[in-house]
Amino acid sequence: MFIRTKVFRNKDGSTRTYLQLVTSERVGDKVRQRVVANLGRLDELQAGSLDRLIEHMIRFSRRQWLLEKARQIEARQARTWGPVLIFRRLWEELGLKATFARLLNGTAIETDFEEAAFAMVLNRLLDPMSKLRVGEWVKTIYRPEWERLELNHFYRALDFLAEHKARLEEALYARVWDLFNLKLDLVLWDTTTTYFEGRAAEGFADYGFSKDKRPDRVQIMIGVLVSRDGFPIAHEVFPGNTAELDTFRHVVEKVKHQFRLGRVILVADRGMVSEKLLEEIEEAGLEYIVGVRMRKLKAAREVLSRPGRYRKVASNLWVKEVIYGGVRYIVCFNPEEKEHDCQIRKQAVARLKEKLAAGEVKQLIGNSAYRRYLKINGSQVGIDEHVLQEEAMYDGKYVLRTNSSLRPEEVAEAYKSLWQVEHAFRELKSGLDLRPIYHWTEKRIRGHVMVCFLALVLEMALRRKIKDLGEEVRYDDLLLDLCQLKAVDLRVDGSHYLARTELTGCAEVAFRAVGVRPPLHVTEMPRT
């Protein structure tokens, strides 16, 4: 088809020109032109309507072109891409790739072992599961280097991690100290236990004091050593029946000889350390900081009632020192938490009054959340005002006990670091899914824990880099947004392209934090 002009002569000798859309058709052995459409007078079309007509036709034409092209596009698969880009950068920046190469002496298995280890670590961070399924999980992630991995690579990588744990930790320690300027004037130590659902390594997993409250299961004990600003330095795995003091003595020697650090302080949460253990720690000349269970210890009430001025450490942390019974206590106060605790109690009391008025006494007595505020005198049940006044004394406060010479604010900050250690253990056992443990040989168990430890190091490295940017984003949200960045395998007219989806949410923060540019929207892949 084409456009032609058709000129008509008027009676007065003037002319008028029309535009026509014409097609050529063969009729017999001749070619004839057939008018498909009369578009109008040329002078009127040139006044502006011609441009509008052309624009409309181009839009219609482009849509048709795109529809035709779309029929030629084959989107074969979309795989998760964002997290592997971020954590691979951190993996290499922390020197793990180079350390693997050095330990394996450049052998042919170097890349497979290193990639298998990285895959398991990323799996712990994103989608924890048994190693028996990690071989399937890697197929959902875009990393071409993983296409050649087989199940035996993962198991052999676990063995490698167990065998070379000490050297990997030493290399990491040196690199992390340099990258993040860690405060290493003191380091903190805490332990946890984790029990077994699967078969256990005989003589390694054993019955012992269970912090998971599962004395019916064999377990192992895990300790993590962290800097005072919460960065993981090393970890140890002990048989399940190891005494806590023995783990502490072990780590003190480790710190002195392996890392050349002078001071280790045992930091423990409320209820996790017995009075007997504290006495043994002091007799051994070691230091501790432990939380006090305020409502279960008479000394805590005495300490809270002692006069003294609080010293401001931060907007949400005030501290004061109290010596009672020859023991040093640090009272910590958070004004924001005080308001929160007070509000929660007021709401509980309001509901309590409603239920008392409705005669729901039996329900209240059986509910521990309400029963603590009740005063029962024979058949008479009412609100215990004395208990309410006593509860107000605890609002926004917690008490620490220590035998260290640290300043009160340093004690409080060190205990806050414990939260990060405890968070690390929660990550190990839940988010990083240390339990249930299915690897039943001692070497595989140790390798599994090492995978979790490396995942924790990568997570803390990313958190630290984001903090250094001055950005405030929730880590879980960041991971979700990174997982939305997909690599899409496209085939167009026989050509191969790799396309990516758009960055969403706070994913771009992660790329800025680690200094990596997001991939191009579309990349033409080499022909194979």
Name each model feature, range by range.
Residues 2-5, 11-13, 17-20, 28-32, ...:
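Anion-binding and metal-coordination hotspots
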Residues 51-112:
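Accessory, often N-terminal, substrate/partner-engagement and coupling regions
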Residues 5-58:
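Short, surface-exposed polybasic/aromatic micro-patch for ligand or macromolecular engagement
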